[in-house]
């Protein structure tokens, strides 16, 4: 793997659309070549995600069953006890995960809410795991507190292209997201930032999301690509499913535009066949969320993932 390469060119939306339009075999060939230039193609990074505070969120994200605006059958749950978080973190480490992400359904944490999360970060870090948190928007100084506690990564997704964003969320604007990402960078935290596809956006808008992500400077260290999980009770429950090969194309284009980032298969993996996941790995995905639940939606069981890894000859980082 050779990192002595020129800076990554910033591509326009039309240039990214042209990548999407390549013949499938050509796109996969290019993406796999770029992937091999920067990563071992047979190693996958494993992260586990735990909801440390569930439901009751004031935001109106149209895909999210945790919003107070929708009746999606999610029971609100207060912040977990430290002991419960550590129990889950130990189980994740024993199962092979190298990173543990803690997610809270907040618009953003108040200082009194942040304090117990800082303790969670310190204790999970002491287990020898990389730490990640997704807590919503951060105020000035909060990213620095998380960094001091031992946080490695902060997740804050752009979700979709600016042109489609207002169709999905009205309680938080695009600049709010960019401002939080800037605070995270200033605190010298690694950035985990991606989006969701299959929400009814056009291919042009998928290209627009990737263009926005790739334009972040520096580019995110981790890029989670979520496939919409259509949850009954949310506004997007009846959205037409994205074609599997279009999702694979999205992974390949993401790899070409962000060659040094870890590209993670995130939500929606439970509904993918092993063959589709294998194509995603071939296209440059090299990270997954590992464990039977992602916040409030399902995820493949550990045993299924291990069987898939064995059949593909890949191992965990």
UniProtKB/Swiss-Prot annotation:
Q: Which CDD domains match?
A: Radical_SAM
Q: Identify the EC number(s).
A: 2.8.1.6
Query: Which pathway does the protein contribute to?
Result: Cofactor biosynthesis; biotin biosynthesis; biotin from 7,8-diaminononanoate: step 2/2
| Reactions this protein catalyses | (4R,5S)-dethiobiotin + (sulfur carrier)-SH + 2 reduced [2Fe-2S]-[ferredoxin] + 2 S-adenosyl-L-methionine = (sulfur carrier)-H + biotin + 2 5'-deoxyadenosine + 2 L-methionine + 2 oxidized [2Fe-2S]-[ferredoxin]
Q: Does the keyword Nucleotide-binding apply?
A: no
Q: Where is the Radical SAM core domain?
A: 42-260
Organism of origin is Thiobacillus denitrificans (strain ATCC 25259 / T1)
Q: Which family does it belong to?
A: Belongs to the radical SAM superfamily. Biotin synthase family.
Annotated [2Fe-2S] cluster binding sites: 101, 132, 192, 264
Cofactor(s) for this protein? [4Fe-4S] cluster; [2Fe-2S] cluster
Q: Its gene?
A: bioB
Amino acids binding [4Fe-4S] cluster: 57, 61, 64
Q: Which PROSITE patterns match?
A: RADICAL_SAM
> According to the record, how does the cofactor bind?
Binds 1 [4Fe-4S] cluster. The cluster is coordinated with 3 cysteines and an exchangeable S-adenosyl-L-methionine.
- Keywords of the record: 2Fe-2S, 4Fe-4S, Biotin biosynthesis, Iron, Iron-sulfur, Metal-binding, S-adenosyl-L-methionine, Transferase
Q: How does it assemble?
A: Homodimer.
Stated role: Catalyzes the conversion of dethiobiotin (DTB) to biotin by the insertion of a sulfur atom into dethiobiotin via a radical-based mechanism.
- Gene Ontology biological process terms from the UniProt entry: biotin biosynthetic process
GO-annotated molecular function: 2 iron, 2 sulfur cluster binding; 4 iron, 4 sulfur cluster binding; biotin synthase activity; iron ion binding
In Swiss-Prot or TrEMBL terms, this protein is called: Biotin synthase
